[in-house]
Design a protein with these regions (language model features):
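Single conserved hydrophobic/aromatic residue that forms the stacking wall/gate
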Residues: 255-265
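Extended, highly charged
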Residues: 1-257
């Protein structure tokens, strides 16, 4: 946001704006006209109250903003870096060792860095999703949706996964996530246990792009985020779940999933 502000690419709206339809309509208009990102400083919730948390939309709504968010100067830069890591030109690096410094930097940035406390743990909010400025964008939508949720789970062996699944608010404490139950959820179901889930909002751009990237099995989303950001990704232990979550996420919602065989449990 500070970067966008400095480049006059952040529109601040300081009057109340409804999170139901109004905020989405404004953002939609800006997207279609190559407009700036928009920060709603007084998002109005469904009950008519003003949220204490602002709502940012259209942060990646232009080609140029997306490149700058990833620290890239052109579309193939990140792909070129990945190819260099997977298929290094050993002959070149032996002749010109300094050419291998970017590769070394990316390799050192891969392992995530464990820290004691995250930004999203400084304040603990009541268990009420309706107090968050989660938009309802279209008249035919089934409800209010978190559209860029960073969903953290782990498999039966403790390997973490970061994914993005549109999350629908059902009530004050329940979210609906669209995912494949035969993966991590199935691992936990086979053990007769519910799966811990963290739904994180915000954080550095590399987290968002890592969560939506198709990655090989031997490269985790946290490692890829480190490569994208060119620095180790800080992660921290979730407060009430046995999960490592992004330490720089602004909000972290902690859940357990229902049984895939019986959603009422």
């Amino acid at each position: 946001m500070n970067h966008l502000d400095q480049r006059d690419e952040l529109l601040r709206i300081d009057r109340p704006v409804d999170v139901e339809y109004e905020a989405g309509a404004i953002a939609d208009l800006l997207v279609k006209n190559d407009g700036p990102a928009v920060l709603f400083e007084q998002p109005r919730l469904a009950d008519g109250t003003i949220s204490s948390i602002p709502l940012l939309m259209n942060a990646f709504g232009s080609h140029d903003r997306t490149l700058r968010a990833l620290g890239a100067s052109h579309e193939t830069e990140i792909g070129d870096r990945m190819v260099a890591m997977m298929k290094p030109d050993i002959g070149l690096y032996m002749r010109k060792p300094w050419k291998g410094l970017p590769l070394l930097r990316d390799a050192l940035a891969m392992p995530p860095k464990k820290v004691r406390k995250g930004k999203g743990q400084r304040v603990r909010l009541p268990n009420d999703l309706t107090k968050l400025p989660i938009p309802k964008t279209w008249p035919m939508d089934g409800g209010h949706f978190i559209t860029l949720p960073l969903v953290v789970t782990k498999d039966g062996d403790g390997e973490h996964n970061l994914g993005m699944y549109r999350a629908q608010v059902h009530n004050e404490t329940e979210l609906g996530l669209h995912w494949q139950i035969h993966k991590h959820a199935a691992d936990h179901a086979a053990k007769g246990e519910r799966m811990p889930v963290a739904v994180c909002i915000g954080g550095p751009p590399e987290l968002i792009f890592s969560a939506i990237s198709p990655l090989p099995d031997n490269l985790s989303e946290y490692q890829f985020a480190g490569i994208l950001g060119q620095k180790s990704l800080p992660i921290t232990k979730a407060l009430t779940q046995d999960l490592w979550v992004p330490a720089e996420a602004d909000i972290c919602l902690l859940y357990t999933s229902p049984s895939p065989r019986d959603p009422t449990k």
